[in-house]
Amino acid sequence: MPLLDGDLEGSGKHSSRKVDSPFGPGSPSKGFFSRGPQPRPPSPMSAPVRPKTSPGSPKTVFPFSYQESPPRSPRRMSFSGIFRSSSKESSPNSNPATSPGGIRFFSRSRKTSGLSSSPSTPTQVTKQHTFPLESYKHEPERLENRIYASSSPPDTGQRFCPSSFQSPTRPPLASPTHYAPSKAAALAAALGPAEAGMLEKLEFEDEVEDSESGVYMRFMRSHKCYDIVPTSSKLVVFDTTLQVKKAFFALVANGVRAAPLWESKKQSFVGMLTITDFINILHRYYKSPMVQIYELEEHKIETWRELYLQETFKPLVNISPDASLLDAVYSLIKNKIHRLPVIDPISGNALYILTHKRILKFLQLFMSDMPKPAFMKQNLDELGIGTYHNIAFIHPDTPIIKALNIFVERRISALPVVDESGKVVDIYSKFDVINLAAEKTYNNLDITVTQALQHRSQYFEGVVKCNKLEILETIVDRIVRAEVHRLVVANEADSIVGIISLSDILQALILTPAGAKQKETETE
């Protein structure tokens, strides 16, 4: 019986509920009558049709008038229940168009349904629009199998091999590998600019625009600073009105080495308070163990900044979370700083503090997935990485105040401790100086380095050594695993030869291959 177009929607919504009734495969129409009469829910579009049938009459699926107007009859949409799958656990509310089992409904068995319909029936089934084919547009090979399954011969297992399926009137389907590039392109098009940049590391092997030596540079350029920010981390912020002494105690209590400085008057971050500031205060105001360091006890951070910076005031060096890691590495090395705060330019919030160690560890995690440049197999002597001339060092009996003077004058972050025979026995870094604040022993800086190192934390990094004949790949792996900031280059006699730092390694891995671009940036 022809129905209005409005009934087409209503019948489609309830077709899955009707077809799941138990019925024999040889009598499709009888199975629908076994449910008993069910009045249709009222709808504005089906109102003109309702007077033609009584509310208690069953809904006939295959009336004889079906042949008179096949394009207008929505009852052929109930064929989805006749072609039953092998599973009997399908829910009445399940939608074959979206479930994986719906793909097999029309490719299972036309013989088991027991239909004796006219030759035009299969054509009409393929034209029905109950199931939106748009949901399969990401899998074209399965879509073709879905369309021609109703007019294909009985199931021969070809649905599991889309590439072998052939239609008498259509060419064979393409192999699934044919669609792999289109899927990757569709994925890249669907992602935003930030996420699309993350996919660049997967295409390193196909890039021919640059040499293989620039693979790490391209990796850092394709990742943003936000990618390296951990899910959970601690960030301590100091107001410039806080006393210097309390600020350093807070660094020790929270186990951090630096903190951004917030100035309430400007409502912005104006600088960083690091262990270097603590060393500079001790170096500048320490007189003797008998004289208290008044400036450390009473000065506020803003007072110290005014006295120390004076005419050398510089704005805070920071970076946006949307900037590339290549820009972060370049900013760290160019400005000769060890900590780079990541500040959101919109909200003004500080998100994280980038360091050489964090960046190199991030890069090392993905090194195994990237092509290995040739220079990774070269040793330190061939590459010339590190400092091998005029190495600053101290002895075990060197006073702390002298070590602090070397830190300030040479602008270095660590001093190897060498015994009388020339062997490296320990290392005294800037981070060890903060223990003076923890122990409240900064009033007596005449004690020896050995005495000061006795109070060192149990998490001491230790002296990690290497030699000049080790390749760069080994050096990177060792410094990342040891979680240290530098390696002492020693010879066979365990005597100091040089120092290789994190900045030296990042320079060799990232900036040296990108030297031409960095020089252009410097000139600008």
UniProtKB/Swiss-Prot annotation:
The modification Phosphothreonine is found at residue 121. SMART domains: CBS. Transmembrane segments: none annotated. It comes from the Eukaryota. AMP 2 binds at residues 257, 357, 429-432, 456, 485-486. InterPro entries: AMPK_gamma/SDS23_families, CBS_dom, CBS_dom_sf. ADP 2 binds at residues 257, 357, 429-432, 456, 485-486. Residues 135-145 have a biased composition (Basic and acidic residues). A motif (AMPK pseudosubstrate) lies at residues 325-346. Residues 112-123 have a biased composition (Low complexity). The AMPK pseudosubstrate motif resembles the sequence around sites phosphorylated on target proteins of AMPK, except the presence of a non-phosphorylatable residue in place of Ser. In the absence of AMP this pseudosubstrate sequence may bind to the active site groove on the alpha subunit (PRKAA1 or PRKAA2), preventing phosphorylation by the upstream activating kinase STK11/LKB1. This is 5'-AMP-activated protein kinase subunit gamma-2. It comes from Pongo abelii (Sumatran orangutan).
